[in-house]
Amino acid sequence: MKKKLVSRLSYAAGAFGNDVFYATLSTYFIVFVTTHLFNAGDHKMIFIITNLITAIRIGEVLLDPLIGNAIDRTESRWGKFKPWVVGGGIISSLALLALFTDFGGINQSKPVVYLVIFGIVYLIMDIFYSFKDTGFWAMIPALSLDSREREKTSTFARVGSTIGANLVGVVITPIILFFSASKANPNGDKQGWFFFALIVAIVGILTSITVGLGTHEVKSALRESNEKTTLKQVFKVLGQNDQLLWLAFAYWFYGLGINTLNALQLYYFSYILGDARGYSLLYTINTFVGLISASFFPSLAKKFNRNRLFYACIAVMLLGIGVFSVASGSLALSLVGAEFFFIPQPLAFLVVLMIISDAVEYGQLKTGHRDEALTLSVRPLVDKLGGALSNWFVSLIALTAGMTTGATASTITAHGQMVFKLAMFALPAVMLLIAVSIFAKKVFLTEEKHAEIVDQLETQFGQSHAQKPAQAESFTLASPVSGQLMNLDMVDDPVFADKKLGDGFALVPADGKVYAPFAGTVRQLAKTRHSIVLENEHGVLVLIHLGLGTAKLNGTGFVSYVEEGSQVEAGQQILEFWDPAIKQAKLDDTVIVTVINSETFANSQMLLPIGHSVQALDDVFKLEGKN
């Protein structure tokens, strides 16, 4: 237990450091570039640098598949992922620190040389951060085969990530002002920004090392793959999966909207309100609100469904933009508007994340093959493209409004304020309206639709393997659970009652522990963990299905201790379910056990009478003779 806790806390520390770094890179570095890197009025160099940053960030997207493939091929004594997490974390942190300098003043004396060096260092930083980020988030399946432990680790990571992303906003102004030689500028001076970057770099390095020392990768042949991912494949999957495509479009516009407004908030508090400390107060509130908001997602999604929750999130964000836009010089009203805008963001992100995850099965049903890694890679791709473009918008807005080196709230003209407010409030509002319009018209992959798809995939698998010959003259099947024995024709589902997925038996479960009835291989495991297919050495395929309609629960109340491709021993616990969760959802908890390719046998018989109470691993069903 202590080892698991250390692993969770270490991974949470890694998530904290990862988001501290990303928040600095994606939001605050552009503020440094526009307000401190060059002399007042040097708009040309600022424009060149921001365009260079945008080009590098978009170009780096082309390298992402190569980065993923390099990580997949890594073999070391420390595992597959940790070398990249630790090494990438150290190198990217040091490179980021260097970017918060003027390289000895050559940005003024030798601008062309500076641009070349800046581009090289930025590219190194961006590539190694991508190695670290990709390796870090890909680690979760490698830390445990237990789905419950993975979920706990993910929860710890979400907490660390939320705190990291928001804490930067809390401390950035106090840190910069504390270390600045001059306090005249609301955003400090170069010295203050350097010490802020130094702290970020130290956090990035220490948390990366913490992940390396505190986590342990579970060696599994299941994750070994020689298949290479290419950007062409990603776009091919998008073209074949209309739900993924339209959701990606909606999410791209959504990301442009929220990223642009979020990145402009420090400018707003510094140059419109003239109170940069108000920004720290805002992110202090955001830190706690973000943790609370995300915790309500399961209950809100269950009550309203995900699509309606997304609409509600956009409505509240638009309300927040409206309040924010009329706040004028009021700090209190600005904070109210900013919070209305922020509160729904974690919820909307989780809606998108869940639908993208469900799009894996949608694409599988539509194309006949499963593209999980490619499908899940779409969100980071959209995030990077949207983040690069929103950063570019921010730099143009800052230049146009005059919020550059030497500017203060008193030097911003009325025209500059008007341009800034239009860009900060009107542009994101339009982006959100476009996003919700696409979502409403094109995205129909609800929880109910996904549950239907999961059941259809299970039926397809059974029908496609029904005629697979078993290399055995007879087969005796033990019960995987304890409970009361039933005939299949007593099951309230025609697919099972009519033996469309093979002959077998059913049980009213006495508890939620599910054991492997024989030694074999996990051929299929539903993402919702409510069904599993095992195959023994003779090619006999057995389906264990927990409850009726339980795919709707989307994994809630179900735990898996194995994954597809796992080798299991007879009597090994493979699944567990919490019966009250099924009954609370008013669903049938009957456990169905069928031999998918039972048609290859001539005869079947029950070894125990119907209604008999059986213990897990008792022999209850036999097939013999060859058809």
From Swiss-Prot:
Q: Which SUPFAM superfamilies match?
A: Duplicated hybrid motif, MFS general substrate transporter
**Encoding gene per record:** lacY
Q: Which residues carry this modification: Phosphohistidine?
A: H545
Q: Which UniProt keywords apply?
A: Cell membrane, Kinase, Membrane, Phosphoprotein, Sugar transport, Symport, Transferase, Transmembrane, Transmembrane helix, Transport
In Pfam terms, one family for this protein is MFS_2
One CC-aspect GO term = plasma membrane
Q: Which CDD domains match?
A: MFS_MelB_like, PTS_IIA_glc
List the Gene3D superfamilies hit by this protein, alphabetically. Glucose Permease (Domain IIA), MFS general substrate transporter like domains
What membrane topology is annotated for this entry?
Multi-pass membrane protein
Please state the protein's primary subcellular location: membrane
- Broad enzyme group: transferase
What's the source species for this entry? Lactobacillus delbrueckii subsp. bulgaricus (strain ATCC 11842 / DSM 20081 / BCRC 10696 / JCM 1002 / NBRC 13953 / NCIMB 11778 / NCTC 12712 / WDCM 00102 / Lb 14)
| GO BP terms, alphabetized | phosphoenolpyruvate-dependent sugar phosphotransferase system; sodium ion transport
Query: Function, please?
Result: Responsible for transport of beta-galactosides into the cell, with the concomitant uptake of protons (symport system), and also for transport of homologous and heterologous exchange of beta-galactosides.
Q: What is this protein called?
A: Lactose permease
